[in-house]
Each structure stands twice: as C-alpha cells, then as structure tokens.
Amino acid sequence: HGNSQFYSHSLKLWEGMEQALNYNVMHSQRGIINLFHSDGQRDAYARRGNAMINQGDDAILLDREGCRKLLPYLDYEQTRFPIYGGLYQPRGGTARHDAVAWGYARAADRLGVDIVENCEVTGFGIENGRVGTVETTRGSIRAGKVGLAVAGRSSQVAAMAGLRLPI
C-alpha cells in the first residue's frame, strides 16, 4: 500500500519537474510495461495494479495478446521465460539521469547552495543538536543549513549525523 502512494506521488513530481526546475530533463511519458512470466507474478502485478487504481493512477493488466498488440517486436515463442502478460502503466516514463542531476544542481545554485564535487563527507560537527560543520576529505565546512543528496549512501551519511532514514 505504501509503495502505491509513493509511486503516485512520484508520478506527480516527475510530471511537474521540468517546470519546477526550469530545466529540460528530457522527461518522456511513453508508458511502461512490467512483464510477468508466471501465474504468481501475474497475481502480484494484479494486486499492484489494483492498489495503483485505488490510488487514482492508471494501471492496466494485460494478457499475452494485449502485450503482443503493444509490443509486437518481442519474441513470444522461443523464449526461456514465456511472456504471460504485463502490467501497463500509461503515465510511466523515463528521464535523462544526467539532465535531472544538472537541473537539480542549477536550481540548488539559484537557492544559494554551494555544491562541492569530488569531496567525500567524513563526518559532521554537531552543535546544540544541529549540524554546524561538515567534515570532508578537503577539510571542514561551516554551514547554517546542510542538505543531504548522496544517492546510494544516504543512510550511511545520515548516520554520521545521528539520523536514521525510513527507507
């Protein structure tokens, strides 16, 4: 249930990202189809699709022929894992990851954020329950406010400041 709410909110954010950042992130909502290859996967995708529909998002459970109509170029006959069907999300899409990063960086710069590349955080100086300094491989940085944007190591860096992330 929580995943469908997260997905729904994410869709809305993606749909407004270029406007919010004033930057072309090459977002293209051409839809996404997650294929399933067993009855068990079909049942799981049916539950996911129903949760998405209950959340107000589009989701269509396709059988094999429905997939064949939308994806005629796939091999349906000589496959190791036969295609039983798919969950189609018409509003799903893609964006260029590098364009998203540049869009965020430019927006952050407009807000007065200094981004220091190739500079590893090694710890934080906590003063009165707040981060006062960021310790890095290039020395200490004093800061009135600190943002955390480190992708795959968010939990580890947050832990250096005594924070535990929910995801």
Which residues does each PLM region occupy?
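Helical element adjacent to the flavin cofactor pocket in flavoenzyme catalytic cores
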Residues: G86-K145, A149, S154
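A short, glycine/Asx- and small/polar-enriched loop/turn
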Residues: G40, L71-I83, G125-G132
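Basic phosphate/pyrophosphate-binding loop/patch that engages nucleotide-derived ligands
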Residues: N50-N54, D109, L163-L165
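A short coil-to-beta-strand element that immediately follows conserved catalytic motifs
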Residues: H27-Q29, V116, P166-I167
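Dinucleotide-binding Rossmann-like beta1-alpha1 core, especially the glycine-rich loop
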Residues: H1-Y73
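Glycine-rich beta-alpha-beta "Rossmann" dinucleotide-binding loop(s) and their flanking helix/strand
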Residues: Q156-I167
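Short glycine-/acidic-enriched loop or helix-start segments at secondary-structure transitions
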Residues: Y45, I126, V157-A159
